[in-house]
From Swiss-Prot:
Molecular function per GO: pentosyltransferase activity; peptidoglycan glycosyltransferase activity
Organism phylogeny: Bacteria, Pseudomonadati, Pseudomonadota, Gammaproteobacteria, Pseudomonadales
A GO cellular component annotation in the UniProt record: peptidoglycan-based cell wall
Organism of derivation: Pseudomonas aeruginosa (strain ATCC 15692 / DSM 22644 / CIP 104116 / JCM 14847 / LMG 12228 / 1C / PRS 101 / PAO1)
Keywords: Cell inner membrane, Cell membrane, Cell shape, Cell wall biogenesis/degradation, Glycosyltransferase, Membrane, Peptidoglycan synthesis, Transferase, Transmembrane, Transmembrane helix
Name the record gives this protein: Biosynthetic peptidoglycan transglycosylase
Topology with respect to the bilayer: Single-pass membrane protein
Keyword Lyase carried by entry: no
UniProt entry tagged with the keyword Cell inner membrane: yes
Length: 232
């Protein structure tokens, strides 16, 4: 009986792996219709009795401003072009920082953030961590770096019910994403760690300081030329 149970579980695991490979392969070419974070926000608003309308307007890689692409890389994942989904030195630094106490520092790459935002629910269980690693490996294998960043910029949360660069540009600055200035792009990147708490349009001292640091990092990374490294 135990052997039969293991055989059945193994079969389900194979089916899940095959289905997830097909899903990720399809989404290399087809824009994701939504994300798990969007579902959670919508359901949560219903439960709270304050339903919200989700704002999202997909923009292709060519329509997204280079300044925002580089700003997000500078603020979130400066080794994006080099790693294969996991930034091991950053993970080690985060673990050392957290062991010393103080605020908890994360080390999620853009690839990991796409995996958990698009495919997974919120939480910190070992099951979710395992699934996050699996989907990260899949998108790093089946998608290009440009596609990963494109999906990230169209799926990131930038305010209450605001998802993606186009909706963020309209919500915070009243203009289309392709018209964002370098300063505005850095401010959008600066609020990504806590988009429901911080405002890109009305930045406080910390967000202004972080945005200035991001602009400096953009220059050190080589500016828009950094994006050429994503074509390799």
């Amino acid at each position: 009986m135990l052997r039969s149970l293991f055989r059945r579980l193994f079969k389900y695991l194979l089916w899940f792996m095959a289905a997830s490979v097909v899903l990720v392969a399809v989404l290399r070419w087809v824009p994701p219709p939504g994300t798990m974070v969007m579902v959670e926000r919508k359901v949560g608003s219903w439960v709270d009795g304050q339903p919200i309308d989700l704002q999202r307007d997909w923009r292709s890689w060519e329509q997204l401003p280079d300044s925002l692409k580089v700003a997000v890389i500078a603020g979130e994942d400066q080794h994006f072009a080099e790693h294969h989904g996991f930034d091991l030195p950053a993970i080690q630094q985060a673990l050392a920082h957290n062991e010393r106490g103080g605020s908890i520092r994360g080390a999620s790459t853009l690839s990991q953030q796409v995996a958990k935002n698009v495919f997974l629910w919120s939480g910190r269980s070992w099951l979710r961590k395992g699934l996050e690693a699996w989907f990260t490996l899949l998108i790093e294998t089946l998608w290009t770096k440009q596609r990963i960043l494109e999906v990230y910029l169209n799926s990131a949360e930038w305010g209450p019910g605001v998802f993606g660069a186009q909706a963020a540009a309209r919500y915070h600055f009243g203009l289309d994403a392709e018209r964002l200035s370098r300063t505005q792009a850095s401010q959008l990147a600066a609020v990504l760690p806590s988009p429901l708490k911080w405002s890109a349009a009305r930045p406080g001292p910390y967000v202004r300081q972080r945005a200035a640091w991001i602009r400096q990092q953009m220059w050190q990374l080589g500016g828009d030329d950094y994006l050429l490294r994503l074509e390799r």
